[in-house]
A protein has these predicted regions:
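HotDog/MaoC-like acyl-thioester-processing domains
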Residues: 2-5, 81-88, 92-135
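Hydrophobic beta-strand-centered segment that forms part of the acyl-chain substrate-binding groove
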Residues: 49-94, 103, 122
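Hot-dog-fold acyl-thioester-processing enzymes
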Residues: 1-72, 132-135
Length: 135
């Protein structure tokens, strides 16, 4: 059985992945429609690039079970892929630090299709604050 790391265990160079998923045509269309976008690329069957953000969160959750808040996200698109393509996401913790009394970690994830880079996703997470009982 896999044991998940705690947020505190996520130090620089902590490897994440691989995560392999296939985004179906129906799921891809739901992503586009939920964003309120009717774009020619949707009609052409192209994957919705912000899916990379969701894959980064899924990749993170494979390794850390702590509840977190995503505080920053940046996605860079390198090329286009079609729906129903198998994607692979791998990542690494690039920084772990404290700011304003809260722990943070920064992750860079690469999403690829057939070995070719599709998207680079950069994200920052902080653990959800826990509050003591006032009883």
């Amino acid at each position: 059985m896999n044991t998940l790391a705690s947020f505190a265990d996520l130090t620089p160079k902590f490897a994440l992945g691989p995560l392999r998923v296939t985004i179906s045509t129906a799921a891809n269309e739901r992503y586009w429609r939920a964003a309120g976008i009717d774009h020619p690329l949707l009609q052409a069957g192209a994957l919705y690039p912000p899916i990379a953000a969701n894959l980064t969160i899924m990749l993170f959750n494979q390794h850390c079970g702590d509840a977190v808040i995503q505080t920053r996200q940046r996605v860079q698109c390198h090329m286009r892929a079609e729906a129903d393509a198998e994607l692979e996401a791998v990542g690494v913790v690039v920084a772990a630090y404290e700011k304003r009394g809260r722990a943070y970690c920064d992750i860079v994830a690469e999403v690829s299709h057939e070995g070719a880079p599709l998207w680079t996703s950069e994200v920052s997470f902080t653990p959800v604050a826990t509050f003591g009982s006032s009883a």
